[in-house]
């Protein structure tokens, strides 16, 4: 029930990664990267499908060898989500995965080879209508830039990025996006700010090597949140030393928190105190797990008492306000019913699923009317 965030998106050009539009006002795409051995086709396919189930728009796969390229061919045949091939050092691998239908090439022109090899990759990408991501990383800056700046700085990352952008410009290739990642939040944020002023290509956001599930999510939320709130960013990845599925969940949580893009349920829950009339924490944890399959955007508030419960319920799709033995249920800001505190989880799950179905049907009818 909350309005969309008043964020003015940075204007950028439009590219497509598979069937996913990137830039020029398109929804911010959420992506992750597999951490299986690419040559283990079964494990990689299973992980990609798990990422698809939680909403991944794009998945990146490392392709370090020709054997991995042959495995990529088989993987591509078995999944639906667009795949980005992560290529370093050997330009021939990029040419090979292009034959196999890759949706995007992630390369670093600085380590892919000489001018002729870069031209061959770009010509192949142009012929097959494959976009490229230029991936600059503070941990792998060119040696001359390391010597010039002494350490990674925003100016160093910008210079590296512009060097590669200019290279593609000279080759008359404009179907690309750019990232300037760093593990330090301030370094990454300032680098992206500088880059956003220099080019109009789409930007892929990320705080690289952010850390484990908890600390990495915090760093990413701060860094990506700052940039997104300024309208910067067209795709994003939350980099975690954790299950890649968690990267997608955190990515959508960041977008939901900024009211930029919603997928699934946005739970609003109190941290609990002695006033709670039912087990709020247990209820929220159980519902988050049970309702992962719901993709309908909804705000659901679960508050343990009447101090803040009614106020949150007024601006929620569904809201529960704790009461003695029974708690008030609100729908679209109107009190509708009372739920037994001892059976809260099952009752609330049923109500949420019913509301999601109702909203989906209403949207389907709206779409049909527009199409008429």
Swiss-Prot record:
<dbReference type="InterPro" id="IPR011005">
    <property type="entry name" value="Dihydropteroate_synth-like_sf"/>
</dbReference>
<comment type="similarity">
    <text>Belongs to the IspG family.</text>
</comment>
<dbReference type="GO" id="GO:0141197">
    <property type="term" value="F:4-hydroxy-3-methylbut-2-enyl-diphosphate synthase activity (flavodoxin)"/>
</dbReference>
<comment type="function">
    <text>Converts 2C-methyl-D-erythritol 2,4-cyclodiphosphate (ME-2,4cPP) into 1-hydroxy-2-methyl-2-(E)-butenyl 4-diphosphate.</text>
</comment>
<feature type="binding site">
    <location>
        <position position="270"/>
    </location>
    <ligand>
        <name>[4Fe-4S] cluster</name>
    </ligand>
</feature>
<feature type="binding site">
    <location>
        <position position="312"/>
    </location>
    <ligand>
        <name>[4Fe-4S] cluster</name>
    </ligand>
</feature>
<keyword id="KW-0411">Iron-sulfur</keyword>
<dbReference type="GO" id="GO:0019288">
    <property type="term" value="P:isopentenyl diphosphate biosynthetic process, methylerythritol 4-phosphate pathway"/>
</dbReference>
<dbReference type="GO" id="GO:0005506">
    <property type="term" value="F:iron ion binding"/>
</dbReference>
<protein>
    <recommendedName>
        <fullName>4-hydroxy-3-methylbut-2-en-1-yl diphosphate synthase (flavodoxin)</fullName>
        <ecNumber>1.17.7.3</ecNumber>
    </recommendedName>
</protein>
<comment type="pathway">
    <text>Isoprenoid biosynthesis; isopentenyl diphosphate biosynthesis via DXP pathway; isopentenyl diphosphate from 1-deoxy-D-xylulose 5-phosphate: step 5/6.</text>
</comment>
<keyword id="KW-0560">Oxidoreductase</keyword>
<keyword id="KW-0004">4Fe-4S</keyword>
<dbReference type="GO" id="GO:0046429">
    <property type="term" value="F:4-hydroxy-3-methylbut-2-en-1-yl diphosphate synthase activity (ferredoxin)"/>
</dbReference>
<dbReference type="GO" id="GO:0016114">
    <property type="term" value="P:terpenoid biosynthetic process"/>
</dbReference>
<dbReference type="GO" id="GO:0051539">
    <property type="term" value="F:4 iron, 4 sulfur cluster binding"/>
</dbReference>
<feature type="binding site">
    <location>
        <position position="273"/>
    </location>
    <ligand>
        <name>[4Fe-4S] cluster</name>
    </ligand>
</feature>
<dbReference type="Pfam" id="PF04551">
    <property type="entry name" value="GcpE"/>
</dbReference>
<dbReference type="InterPro" id="IPR004588">
    <property type="entry name" value="IspG_bac-typ"/>
</dbReference>
<feature type="binding site">
    <location>
        <position position="305"/>
    </location>
    <ligand>
        <name>[4Fe-4S] cluster</name>
    </ligand>
</feature>
<keyword id="KW-0408">Iron</keyword>
<keyword id="KW-0479">Metal-binding</keyword>
<dbReference type="InterPro" id="IPR045854">
    <property type="entry name" value="NO2/SO3_Rdtase_4Fe4S_sf"/>
</dbReference>
<keyword id="KW-0414">Isoprene biosynthesis</keyword>
<dbReference type="InterPro" id="IPR016425">
    <property type="entry name" value="IspG_bac"/>
</dbReference>
């Amino acid at each position: 029930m909350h309005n969309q965030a008043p964020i003015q998106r940075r204007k950028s050009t439009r590219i497509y990664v598979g069937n996913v539009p990137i830039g020029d006002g398109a929804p911010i795409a959420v992506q992750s990267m597999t951490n299986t051995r690419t040559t283990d086709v079964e494990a990689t396919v299973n992980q990609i499908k798990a990422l698809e189930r939680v909403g991944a728009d794009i998945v990146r796969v490392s392709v370090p060898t020709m054997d991995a390229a042959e495995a990529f061919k088989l993987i591509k045949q078995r999944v639906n989500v667009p795949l980005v091939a992560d290529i370093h050092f050997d330009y021939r691998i990029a040419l090979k995965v292009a034959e196999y239908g890759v949706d995007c090439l992630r390369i670093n022109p600085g380590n892919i080879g000489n001018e002729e090899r870069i031209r061959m990759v770009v010509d192949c990408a142009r012929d097959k209508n494959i976009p490229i991501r230029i991936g600059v990383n503070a941990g792998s800056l060119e040696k001359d830039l390391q010597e010039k700046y002494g350490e990674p700085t925003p100016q160093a990352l910008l210079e590296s990025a512009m060097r590669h952008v200019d290279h593609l410009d000279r080759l008359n290739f404009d179907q690309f996006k750019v990232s300037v990642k760093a593990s330090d939040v301030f370094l990454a944020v300032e680098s992206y700010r500088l880059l956003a002023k220099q080019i109009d290509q789409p930007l892929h956001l990320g705080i690289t090597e952010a850390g484990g599930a908890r600390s990495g999510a915090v760093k990413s939320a701060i860094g990506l949140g700052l940039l997104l709130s300024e309208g910067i960013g067209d795709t994003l990845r939350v980099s975690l030393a954790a299950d890649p599925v968690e990267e997608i969940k955190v990515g959508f949580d960041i977008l939901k928190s900024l009211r930029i893009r919603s997928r699934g349920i946005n739970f609003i829950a109190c941290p609990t105190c002695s006033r709670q009339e039912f087990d709020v924490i247990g209820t929220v944890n159980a519902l988050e797990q049970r309702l992962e399959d719901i993709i309908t955007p909804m705000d659901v508030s679960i508050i343990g008492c009447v101090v803040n419960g009614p106020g949150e319920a007024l601006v929620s799709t569904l809201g529960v306000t704790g009461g003695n033995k029974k708690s008030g249920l609100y729908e679209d800001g109107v009190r509708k019913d009372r739920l037994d505190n001892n059976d809260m989880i099952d009752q609330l799950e049923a109500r949420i699923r019913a509301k999601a179905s109702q909203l989906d049907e209403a949207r389907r009818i709206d779409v049909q009317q527009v199409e008429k």
